[in-house]
Amino acid sequence: MSDLSQALGFLCLILCILFALFFLGTLIYFITSRGISVISWEFLTEVPRRAMTKGGVAPAIVGALYLTVGAIGFALPLGLACAIYLCEYSPAGYIVNIIRLSINNLAGVPSVVFGLFGFAVFVKVFGFGVSILSGSLTLGIMALPGIISASQEAILAVPQSYKEASLALGATHWQTIRKVVLPTALPGILTGVILNVGRVAGETAPILFTAATFYTRGYPDSVFSEVMALPYHIYALMTEGTRPEVQTGIAYEIGRASCRERV
C-alpha cells in the first residue's frame, strides 16, 4: 500500500511539473513568435522618435537598469545588516518576534501600496520629486523584506558547529560572522537577491507614482530626473492603442532579460 501511495504521489508531482512547463512553454512561444519580428539593433539602441512610432526603447531599458541597480544598492546592504542583527545579535524576546512577523507581512503587501508610500514620503515630504531617486528608494523598500527574509534563512542554515569551531580558535563574534557565517550563507543570500531583482525590474505600480514618464528626449542626466522604464512603457503602450506587435516585442525583450537574470 505504501509503494502504491508513493507511486501515485510521484505521478501527481510529475503531472504538476509537466502542467507548469506546458504553460511556460506556451507563454514563451506566444511572446517570441509575435514579438521577435520587431526586435532589431535600432529598436534596442535608439531613442523613440516621431511620437513613439519610430526609433527604439533604449531610454526605457537604461531607465529600468538605473532603477533596479539603485533599488538593490539601497536594499542589499540594509537588508543584510538587518538579517545579521536579527540572527546574531538581537536577544530573543517578544519585540524581536514582532519585528520578524512584521517583515514577513511586509513581503506580502501589494506593490501599489509601496508606490503610494513612496509618492507620499519621497516625492512630497522629502521633495525628491518624480525621479530616479524616488523610484529607486521605493523599489528598494519593496525589496527589503524579501532580502531580509532570504538572508535570515541562509544565515540560520549555517551549522552551529562552524561557529563554535571558529570561536574555539580564538576568533571574535564579528570575525566569525565575516569569515565563516557570511561566506557559508552566500549562496542563499544571492538567491534571495536574484529573486528580488526580478521582482523589482518588473514592477509598474511603484514607479508609476514615483519615477516613470512615458517619453523623454534622451537619457536621464541625474538621479533627480524622470525616467522611462520598460514595465511602465508596456503599460503606457497597452493603454494608448499603439500597434500590438510592438507591445509584444517589448514584452519579449523583458521576458528574455528576466530569464537571463534568473539563470
Predicted feature locations:
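Transmembrane alpha-helices
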Residues: 72, 150-151, 173-211
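Generic hydrophobic transmembrane alpha-helix motif, especially the helices
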Residues: 104-140
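Glycine/proline-centered hinge or cleavage motifs at structural transition points of membrane proteins
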Residues: 110, 169-170, 183
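Interhelical loop and adjacent transmembrane-helix boundary motif
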Residues: 51, 55, 207-258
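Hydrophobic alpha-helical transmembrane segments of multipass integral membrane proteins
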Residues: 62, 66-74, 78, 82, ...
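Short coil/turn motifs that cap or connect alpha-helices
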Residues: 161, 172-173
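Periplasmic/extracellular loop-to-transmembrane helix junction in inner-membrane transport proteins
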Residues: 1-12, 30-71, 92, 236-248
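Transmembrane-helix boundary motif in ABC transporter permease subunits
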Residues: 71-103
